């Protein structure tokens, strides 16, 4: 089923999303990869506040290429999510509601998704140039020294994703294998 949602993504929204749903997201989300995630967790361990508002946030695991003239961002394809697995449960426990990436997630992340009524979306790998057309604005908000791994805030319009793991823990990567094995 196709669904259109707007950020911030709240628990009421995540409870309505089911594994396998096609979703189009509009609104403001953050972009961060493993170096930025590590830096956020290190800051928390030092007793510092996060540099972004994590409550009801969506983080897209992506490292953009340089923007072409007249565009807010270059190619914007997803990064493999497992690189963030050691950090994701902490951010989910602090209020993050959605993650966008590609690939499988660890049991610890799936448990945190269920515990916090969050979701994990997949974006299509290899389609970064097409995905960038859904990004209308991009700005670095912190950790500029990380270059392409700096945390960005981006505005998106009808950004296409698929619900891979829903708030109940249903996992498309597992159910799809079983479904196609039965054919």
Sequence positions of predicted segments:
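Short, structured beta-strand/loop micro-motifs enriched in basic residues and often containing a Trp
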Residues: 1-9
